Amino acid sequence: MRVLGLMSGTSADGVDAVLAEFSGSPSEPKWSLLNLVCTPYPEDLRQTVINAGQGITLNSREWLELSESITEVHAQAALACDPSAQAELVGSHGQTVWHRPPQKNHRGASWQILQAPLLAELLKRPVVHDFRAADLALGGQGAPLVPMADAALLGRVGGWRGVLNLGGIANLTLIPPRSGPDRRASVMGWDCGPANSLIDLAVEQISKGKLAFDHDGSIAASGHPHTTTIERWLKEAFFQLPPPKSTGREQFGLADLEQRLKELPKLSTANRVATLTAFSAAVVAQDLNNLRIRNLVRPLELIVAGGGSRNPVLMNELRQRCRGMRVLNSDELGLSAEAREGLAFALLAWWHCLQHPGNAPAITGAKRAAVLGVRADPA
């Protein structure tokens, strides 16, 4: 089956559309990536999405128009990726505007904004959406949902394999080896903390809105990270939590950035960006090191995808902090760094049609595995 996968992450830079074909066993599918198109959000829409994700109040009309605009850009991305309508099905994550993990006093909740019936009608094809709801209803975090797809798409090697997505948030998948005593272990996955979210916000502030991100890590490359501050930040409560855990821009957004910058008052602009960049690598390295210390997992390699994989300073920080582990870009395995999440949600939509579970209780904390997503058909 040919499926379109649509993904817009916490960086809110636009929609990644992937056209893929799947066949064979759901858990070990044969797949091919047929096309990838990245459609940016208009700047005013991007800013509204970021503001909404940081708790800035919108009125009812603004929420309505935001959901409509997001849906229209998703449709544009889908049509650009699949102009001849080869796909029989669309899997769309929607745009996360708020994510609340389960806490002692209330269940978890997550809101991905999208008008799925409108998207189905615009594309004249069924759309599977709202992928997180079933896991949340079962007491799970609702995130991350990509690890089971990672395991199915990338397969196993002779040792533990890590897959790291550096979007707005850094999320990690660990895939068990194909042989040896750990071969029957469960896939693991969780959110480590901020990846690009704080860096992007800082660069936007510094440039007075002229830059949306640190292109090629050029600002960070001209500075030096403040190691003592990073070590102090790593002791914060979230970074001490064991998996399962999930997070988003509501935790690592503008308010968090401003607090961190107050702790760096005497540093130059370049040193501040370098510190935030090194911090993003450090939160991942600390989680991996904690697993190693507990003799749970020691990955042979770490495959990196997402926008942060294009930042050579961030990638170098990862290599420095994850010694003994091969750190490589997913491009080296034939999977474009920009395609990974769109491909994953295309697979989750295909699994929905096959009634194949898409979550993993060991990863999200849900009571049981469940088929993910809700289907909206054209009118």
Curated annotation (Swiss-Prot):
InterPro entries registered for this protein in UniProt: Anhydro_N_Ac-Mur_kinase, ATPase_NBD
Keyword Protein transport: no
UniProt keyword Mitochondrion present: no
Residues annotated as binding ATP: 9-16
Pathway: Amino-sugar metabolism; 1,6-anhydro-N-acetylmuramate degradation; Cell wall biogenesis; peptidoglycan recycling
EC number: 2.7.1.170
GO BP terms: 1,6-anhydro-N-acetyl-beta-muramic acid catabolic process; amino sugar metabolic process; peptidoglycan turnover
Keywords from the named record: ATP-binding, Carbohydrate metabolism, Kinase, Nucleotide-binding, Transferase
GO MF term (any one): ATP binding
Catalytic activity annotation: 1,6-anhydro-N-acetyl-beta-muramate + ATP + H2O = N-acetyl-D-muramate 6-phosphate + ADP + H(+)
PANTHER family xref list: ANHYDRO-N-ACETYLMURAMIC ACID KINASE
Homology family: Belongs to the anhydro-N-acetylmuramic acid kinase family.
Role, per record: Catalyzes the specific phosphorylation of 1,6-anhydro-N-acetylmuramic acid (anhMurNAc) with the simultaneous cleavage of the 1,6-anhydro ring, generating MurNAc-6-P. Is required for the utilization of anhMurNAc either imported from the medium or derived from its own cell wall murein, and thus plays a role in cell wall recycling.
Protein name listed in UniProt: Anhydro-N-acetylmuramic acid kinase
Source organism: Prochlorococcus marinus (strain MIT 9303)
Lineage: Bacteria, Bacillati, Cyanobacteriota, Cyanophyceae, Synechococcales
